Amino acid sequence: MASSINNSSQPTVPSISNNSHGDSFVNEGPPSNFKNNSLTSSTHSSTDHVNVLPISQDKEMDISSPVKKQKASYSNKSPNKAPIQKSRGSSLKSHLETESQQTPVKRRRRKATIRNVDYCSACGGRGLFICCEGCPCSFHLSCLEPPLTPENIPEGSWFCVTCSIKSHHPPKHPLSIWSQLYDWIDSQNPSQYRLPDDLVHYFHGISRGDTGAYKETEGEMDTDEFSALPTGSSITNLAYCGYCSKPSMGACWVYGCQLCDTFYHKNCKEHAKKCSHDSIGKKGMRVPKNAVVIRTPLVLDTTSNTLNPKVMISGWQFLMGEFPSDELLYFPRLPVSCLYKVSEDGLIKDFLYAIGIEAKKFNNERKKRELEVIPPDVKSALLPARTHPNLPIALRTLFNKART
């Protein structure tokens, strides 16, 4: 019995034949979508067109499985569609597009307009200013170094000393101990002398405004919160009497001992012997230690009617002028246990006095050094003239020392 395909009216189906080695192979027929094929087993007749399909006995054909097709013919894929391969350029482009979507675009911002202050950055006053183009500073023409006049104002943009140093970088001073200090001084704008902030804000009742001017801050203090009390000011540094343990009350002031940290009221001064200092009666009392005292040079007490008119008093006491002269020597009068104000005249005189002392010391040392480098023959010629009336006293003294 042989297997046959009855397909008289339809095209032939693929036939399976064996080669010389006994392997079967497929002869492709019509397309795979061809329908109405019947596969039967019957005795062949001479009238039908029969294609005999010899099947190897050792290899049976699985009729239920579909016929395998070659890869090169009748592919299910469209022949016009080739596999898409991404080039390197396209992958790089897609990568850049993805990265640009994740990273925000940086836009160039316009430079903000600088708004200069409406007061002089050197003295804090008002008036006609010249404004810096690189910072908010403004200056009076007379406050600059060197000063300017309305006739020689530079044309175009003007920059202060600090901005000019940052942009131009001038040569620095030779390396020395003070070179960094000199460089810092050269890079600073001119500024008026101001008291340190610790000293300005220490005294209760006064402060300094934005322009540098002093202002009074008197008013009722809110004591509901502990933070309302200024811990670093003079109002919390009270001096208490060593006898009655009370601070200054009205006209009863507190004074401190010069040899220890004990304080007494004026009415309790007879109890000052508790300090056990023998010289307490001679040196009197002093200002409380907790109060800040500006030390100025001692001057003669010309206003005192005491037997010893050459008693030296402090310049701070001398400048307090509002108190009677009999209390200047022993009991400098204070409204409370702390100082509220610092005399401006006392600061100026103290500063000038310190400069004068340093200048005298410097001049004496300079003259002494100049005398030391004089050759011996020249010095011997100058020595006979040491008693000349026009020769300064300092040089006369130096000549005497050199002679000896």
From Swiss-Prot:
InterPro entries: Chromatin_regulatory_protein, Zinc_finger_PHD-type_CS, Znf_FYVE_PHD, Znf_PHD, Znf_PHD-finger, Znf_RING/FYVE/PHD. GO terms for molecular function: zinc ion binding. SUPFAM superfamilies: FYVE/PHD zinc finger. A zinc finger (PHD-type) spans 117-166. The keyword Metal-binding applies. The modification Phosphothreonine is found at residue 47. Residues 1-110 are annotated as: Disordered. GO terms for cellular component: cytosol; nucleus; Rpd3S complex. Keywords: Metal-binding, Phosphoprotein, Zinc, Zinc-finger. Residues 1-22, 87-104 have a biased composition (Polar residues). One of its GO terms (biological process) is transcription initiation-coupled chromatin remodeling. It comes from the Eukaryota. PANTHER family: CLR6 HISTONE DEACETYLASE ASSOCIATED PHD PROTEIN-1 CPH1, TRANSCRIPTIONAL REGULATORY PROTEIN RCO1. This is Uncharacterized protein C16C9.05. The lineage of its organism: Eukaryota, Fungi, Dikarya, Ascomycota, Taphrinomycotina.
